[in-house]
């Protein structure tokens, strides 16, 4: 009955996901130094241990061990420990353990902080391609939290989440667009215009191609929110501009086109 048990299935799926996600980058990590006949700065056994702790839900153990590598002068430039930190914090943020959530009350933000550091350390993009699924889950949770703050008109708090989103991917037009819109709401007009300009240039250059599904969802939300916001202020020209700029993606989207017709 193992495979008929939803809880067991979920655990199995998570185990397989993490295993597939981490196996390749860790192998590459070891090979990177093996080519030069040098011992790796971080032993493969340590990564295996971190992986097993992730699978077993021992997230605090992951944090305690991985953070040592992020703070040690010899290993702090290595990207992989940062993504372990990020994943552990993210799983804590999703936990139903109230004591754990109270202890790590900023777990989602910490997950974003270490994910951002991972991206910066992975300058050659050697590892990031192996963590696409994780980053998409992180984006989704971040987008949801930011939307809550937007709905509550807590724009300064929302701003920090959208900033993390474009830090994870500087070519994410939806993140830049929403970052600009919450800055606009916070009366930071100049910064808002700069962020909007970045979003516009990305849409002109790429037309929304190559975005992950969650990034497309963010862009749709950003376009609708920004267009309606500008329309409410009487700026119909710019409101239409943003919807038309994403026509390649949302030209047949009923919700987006309904907003356009209302302008």
What does each model-found stretch correspond to?
Residues 33-35, 214-217, 222-263:
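Terminal, low-structured helical/coil segments at or just beyond the last alpha-helical repeat
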Residues 31-103:
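Start-of-domain marker
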Residues 76, 87-140, 202-221:
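Short coil/linker segments at helix-helix boundaries
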Residues 49, 85, 92, 138, ...:
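Structural register within alpha-helical repeat arrays
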Residues 79-81, 175, 209-210, 222, ...:
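TPR alpha-solenoid repeat register
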């Amino acid at each position: 009955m193992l495979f008929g048990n939803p809880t067991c299935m979920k655990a199995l799926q998570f185990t397989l996901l993490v295993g597939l996600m981490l196996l390749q980058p860790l192998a590459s990590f070891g090979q990177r130094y093996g080519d030069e006949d040098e011992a790796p700065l971080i032993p493969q056994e340590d990564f295996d241990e971190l992986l097993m702790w992730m699978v077993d839900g021992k997230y605090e153990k992951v944090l305690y061990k991985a953070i040592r590598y992020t703070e040690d002068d010899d290993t702090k430039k290595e990207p992989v420990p940062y993504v372990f930190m990020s994943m552990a914090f993210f799983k804590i943020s999703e936990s139903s353990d109230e004591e754990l959530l109270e202890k790590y009350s900023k777990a989602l933000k910490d997950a974003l902080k270490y994910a951002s550091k991972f991206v910066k350390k992975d300058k050659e993009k050697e590892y990031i391609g192996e963590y696409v699924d994780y980053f998409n889950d992180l984006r989704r949770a971040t987008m949801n939290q930011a939307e809550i703050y937007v709905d509550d008109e807590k724009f300064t708090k929302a701003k920090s989440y959208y900033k993390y989103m474009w830090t994870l991917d500087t070519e994410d037009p939806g993140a830049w667009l929403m970052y600009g819109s919450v800055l606009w709401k916070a009366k930071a007009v100049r910064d808002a215009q700069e962020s909007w300009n970045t979003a516009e240039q990305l849409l002109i250059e790429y037309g929304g191609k190559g975005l992950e599904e969650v990034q497309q969802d963010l862009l749709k939300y950003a376009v609708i929110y920004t267009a309606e916001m500008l329309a409410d202020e009487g700026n119909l020209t710019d409101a239409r501009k943003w919807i038309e700029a994403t026509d390649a993606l949302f030209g047949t989207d009923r919700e987006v086109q309904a907003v356009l017709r209302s302008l």
